[in-house]
């Protein structure tokens, strides 16, 4: 699961991918769910598209032994369910990866103290009635938070 923010008011959002299916070398189908305000849950389905792949420097590999590089691309995920609360997420992502034999796997950060994002999504959410909100989520540190935003929000969201 990843945690993030939605809208100018920085409402909490949680994103969880339940299924990933390779369509071809550049496209993957994603299924999962979003949760806002801790109670509103919408199932989602969409795609990620790979735009580029990079390798980590030797220095980065020594700090994060479970990361060989990053995959960069764009995404579009449509929520389905109650039309009042569903919409479409779209934007850009990065995902850390590692090579394990002949397999490419999701990267892992074994040193949580580094607070390094291995998965990061930035973009917009568009509601069924056309309302657009900025959104971002990640596996560690929420990207694009306002300067005065507290990462450990006690507001109950």
Where are these regions (language model features)?
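Central antiparallel beta-sheet cores of small beta-barrel/beta-sandwich binding domains
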Residues: 1-157
